[in-house]
């Protein structure tokens, strides 16, 4: 429920950060 949604949001944020680091 809520925990799953939060985990997904954090996961997406982490992925974006990782992608930005790789693109750099």
From Swiss-Prot:
Keywords, alphabetical: Antibiotic, Antimicrobial, Cytolysis, Fungicide, Hemolysis
Biological process terms in GO annotation: defense response to bacterium; defense response to fungus; killing of cells of another organism
Function: Antimicrobial peptide, active against the Gram-negative bacterium E.coli K12-594 (MIC=3.12 ug/ml), the Gram-positive bacteria B.subtilis KCTC 3086 (MIC=3.12 ug/ml), S.aureus KCTC 1928 (MIC=25 ug/ml) and M.luteus KCTC 3063 (MIC=1.56 ug/ml), the antibiotic resistant bacteria methicillin-resistant S.aureus (MRSA) (MIC=25 ug/ml) and vancomycin-resistant Enterococci (VRE) (MIC=25 ug/ml), and the fungi C.albicans KCTC 7965 (MIC=50 ug/ml) and C.tropicalis KCTC 1925 (MIC=3.12 ug/ml). Has very low hemolytic activity on rat erythrocytes.
Identification of the protein by name: Cryptonin
Taxonomic lineage: Eukaryota, Metazoa, Ecdysozoa, Arthropoda, Hexapoda
């Amino acid at each position: 429920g809520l925990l799953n949604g939060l985990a997904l949001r954090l996961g997406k944020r982490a992925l974006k950060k990782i992608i930005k680091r790789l693109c750099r």
